[in-house]
């Protein structure tokens, strides 16, 4: 009897700490997301917001983001770096990225070294309490185009290798943000080893997977459970659509969740 009561008490304590183990995901368009974890940690991924044609105007006030604990940047292109510098300065958030790009950010003063987390593929890190992040491969390119704040002159700097991220929340839920990527064979390893619960996959084509390639990745490599299509429709070359993605998938076990920019999902 006492053992049973102890089990009930432990369940009540767990639920009080993380009510229903719920968490939220907000999409700003392109590849930009805000994750609010079960423990209240706020994580931004590729925060391209103020310059994003798909982000609703009401959400372009960066102050409205409130607390930010961590920013993850997949690679150095402007539509992924986005507002990283401003948000980091305003919030004091840690900023995690590949080690080489981290040096570029630090040396150019984009983000102070004291806020940077420079790491690399495979080895997991815990940048904030309760959140585990693993960097994985992405088939793309990376460079940092820096605009001098005084002269306005642009210069190009090393961006290291592009990446995707496996983000594991306090409740064990795993998100795979693929970054910008083409399809690659080791997606099979990502699916088998990390077993993501939710995948955020680019479908726009031209610079990344198109709907057919993304569908192949889902059905043949990742073994996806839930998929949110991203990185489409923001600029003219990104012609892939969720409808074409669904058609290319055919019969599949994956649940496709199509979000609207600004929308918040609760899991």
Language-model regions, residue ranges each:
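Short internal beta-strands
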Residues: 93-100, 226-231
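Cap/insert and terminal regions of metallo-dependent hydrolase folds
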Residues: 70, 182-263
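Pre-active-site segment of Zn-dependent metallo-hydrolases
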Residues: 38-78, 82-89, 112, 142-157, ...
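Zn-dependent metallo-beta-lactamase
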Residues: 2-42, 49-51, 251, 261-263
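Structural motif
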Residues: 41-43, 69-70, 131, 173-175, ...
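Divalent metal-coordination and catalytic microenvironments
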Residues: 35, 46, 75, 83, ...
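Metallo-beta-lactamase
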Residues: 28, 99-173, 248-267
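Active-site environment of divalent metal-dependent phosphoester hydrolases
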Residues: 51-52, 78-82, 102-105, 123-126, ...
């Amino acid at each position: 009897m006492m053992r049973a009561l102890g089990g009930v008490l432990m369940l009540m304590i767990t639920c009080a700490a993380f009510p229903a183990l719920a968490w939220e995901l907000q999409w700003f368009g392109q590849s930009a997301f805000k994750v609010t974890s079960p423990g209240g940690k706020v994580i931004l991924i590729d925060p391209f917001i103020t310059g994003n044609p798909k982000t609703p105007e009401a959400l372009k006030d960066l102050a409205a983001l409130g607390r930010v604990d961590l920013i993850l940047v997949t690679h150095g292109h402007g539509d992924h770096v986005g507002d990283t510098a401003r948000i980091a300065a305003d919030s004091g958030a840690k900023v995690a990225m590949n080690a080489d790009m981290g040096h570029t950010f630090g040396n150019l003063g984009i983000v102070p070294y004291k806020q940077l987390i420079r790491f690399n593929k495979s080895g997991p890190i815990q940048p904030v309490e309760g959140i585990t992040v693993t960097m994985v491969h992405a088939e793309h390119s990376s460079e940092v185009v820096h605009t001098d704040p005084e002269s306005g002159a642009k210069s190009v700097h090393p961006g290291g290798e592009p990446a995707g991220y496996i983000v594991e929340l306090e409740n064990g839920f795993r998100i795979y943000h693929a970054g910008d990527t083409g399809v690659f064979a080791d997606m099979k390893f990502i699916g088998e080893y990390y077993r993501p619960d939710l995948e955020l996959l680019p479908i726009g084509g031209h610079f990344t997977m198109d709907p057919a390639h993304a569908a192949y990745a889902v059905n043949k490599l990742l073994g996806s459970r839930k998929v949110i299509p991203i990185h489409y429709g923001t600029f003219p070359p990104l012609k892939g659509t969720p409808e074409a993605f669904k058609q290319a998938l055919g019969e599949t076990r994956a649940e496709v969740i199509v979000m609207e920019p600004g929308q918040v999902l609760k899991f």
